[in-house]
Amino acid sequence: MTFSSTGSVRTPVLDVAYEYTGEPGGVPVVLLHGFPYDVRAFDDAAAVLADRGAFVLAPYLRGFGPTRFRDATTPRSGQQAGLAQDLLDFLDALGLDDAVLAGYDWGGRAACLVAALRPGRARGLVTVDGYNVQDIAASGEPAPPDVERTFWYQYYFHSERGRRGLERNREELCELLWRTWSPTWAGASVAFPASAPSLHNPDFVDVVIHSYRHRYGLAEGDPRYQELEDLIAAQPPIPVPTVVLESGADGVGGPLDPQEREHFTGAYEHRLLPGIGHNVPQEAPEAFADAVLSLL
């Protein structure tokens, strides 16, 4: 662990746990992890950023680690609009007008959405997954078979068998995803135990299952996020300065679609990372940190 401190802030829906390092007077940088990861993914990159004067914060997403829902009756939604609103609420709770946003997987999606829908809150964006915004209306369209097979876990989670499998075997299943999504990363199995406790959040299973059903139109969303979902459905452009990091050896999904470039209307840079898998900040912390530093 290289973050120097831990904290918690209350938002309308969550008590958000986070870790931070660096001087509070530095440029704020919010690092956003994905599924099935946690803030440990940023330990090395955060140290580099703090040494360069940034104030680095890494929240645990809803359903992960010490972050908790405030109300037992709140739907345990994993929908993308909820993640985006959580990020906006996190910035508000800390009194941050804006920040450089950097993330991957679920966290990259939250960062992309805030950069698109509330560009004044994002000084810049680092997104590992390109235009990481779900197009739910088109979710019924098949991908090429070689890509579809990498989504087996998503289709598994559509069934009650998959829910039970995640509940009973969460560490085994998620460690398998770590290894298969980062096939060239020899340290995946060694690094996994440090993040495994975050998968035992009491809401982890509900949030994950809802996320992978909602994105395919198989589950209703939380009504409080419907206005945001309506805006997201238009696939809004991202006008803020952006660095896209593309994994050269990602074991889930396929290569970035060149047509995604049209979604970025501000300053833009694409960086290919040969031999790097899905968990970019943990596999290539210097490259990840360098992308963030280019936006400070």
Where are the model-predicted features located?
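Flexible "cap/lid" subdomain of the alpha/beta-hydrolase fold that forms the substrate-access gate
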Residues: 2, 15-16, 28, 64-98, ...
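A short loop-to-beta-strand scaffold at the N-terminal edge of the catalytic core in hydrolase folds
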Residues: 11-20
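C-terminal alpha-helix
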Residues: 94, 291-295
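Conserved HGGG/HGGXW glycine-rich cap/lid loop of the alpha/beta-hydrolase fold
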Residues: 19-69, 90
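Catalytic histidine-centered segment of alpha/beta-hydrolase-like enzymes
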Residues: 276-284
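An N-terminal hydrophobic leader/cap segment in hydrolases
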Residues: 1-8
